[in-house]
Amino acid sequence: MQSVDLTEPLEAIKLKHGDRWYLAEDAVHDAEALWQGKANRHGVFMGYETITLAKVGSCNAEARIIQTGKGWWAATSSYDYGYGGAGSAPSVWERQAFLNREDALAAIAEEIASSFAAIAQERNGCSSEKHRSDAKRMFEELRAYKTPQLTLF
């Protein structure tokens, strides 16, 4: 998986703008310049694409991706299941920039797969056998997504 670690330049931007960097529009502009992308005043990239990676029963997994002017891909995940979920939109504060679309999608599929692996093991008052079964199938579909079958021809 090819990617660029943006931790250092993003930390430098935060340091430059002080403790309240997250409120500084100039900090967002500096991060936009790093990515060469257009974001709203909160740093969320404008015009990102949402791609459904897998759907089983009440479980859903999506990637949210955008290619910036630098040719990098920002990617985040969104997933939900019968009694919870998590997600975010791609922003200028993403620490990992992918060099191609396929790697971005594979990374997000892997990230969400690990969440569904944990959900499949839950034994709390909210989970049911159906939830665990659906989560296990989601894990399997997402693992297949990130490791596509190679063909000989």
Where are these regions (language model features)?
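A short, exposed loop/beta-hairpin motif centered on an aromatic-Gly-Thr core
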Residues: 78-114
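Short arginine-rich
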Residues: 109-126
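Short amphipathic beta-strand and strand-loop transition segments with alternating hydrophobic
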Residues: 60-67
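Intrinsically disordered, low-complexity charged/polar segments
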Residues: 121-145
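Negatively charged, low-complexity tracts enriched in Asp/Glu with abundant Ser/Thr
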Residues: 1-60, 136-153
